[in-house]
Curated annotation (Swiss-Prot):
Organism: Cuscuta reflexa (Southern Asian dodder)
The protein's name: Small ribosomal subunit protein uS14c
Homology family: Belongs to the universal ribosomal protein uS14 family.
Keyword 4Fe-4S: no
InterPro entries named in the record: Ribosomal_uS14, Ribosomal_uS14_bac/plastid, Ribosomal_uS14_CS
């Protein structure tokens, strides 16, 4: 189980990312449209003035049961440990163990 403070920090980052998503996107589009370098620098300054935690690269995908930050499967939203346990207990319909 991940520490609760880390899980809360990621939730806060997700909220900030959603809040500033459109602002960040519009500023990035403006950078590509503006031909003058001096105008681009002004836009870069605006972009850098946004909160650091609002950048989407600072988000981390976590297991929604345990909060584990590594070995996550996107399709299920689970870490590999919990996914294996749930498949063996037949709690995930349609998931089968591979054998060849």
């Amino acid at each position: 189980m991940a520490r609760k403070s880390l899980i809360q920090r990621d939730k806060k980052r997700k909220k900030l990312e959603l809040k500033y998503h459109w602002i960040r996107g519009s500023l990035k589009k403006e950078i590509h449209k503006v031909p003058l370098l001096s105008d681009k620098w002004e836009i870069y300054v605006k972009l850098q003035s946004l909160p650091r935690n609002s950048a989407p690269t600072r988000l981390h995908r976590r297991c929604f049961l345990t909060g584990r930050p590594r070995a996550n499967y996107r399709d299920f939203g689970l870490s590999g440990h919990r996914l294996r346990e749930m498949v063996q207990a037949c709690l995930l319909p349609g998931a089968t163990r591979s054998s060849w």
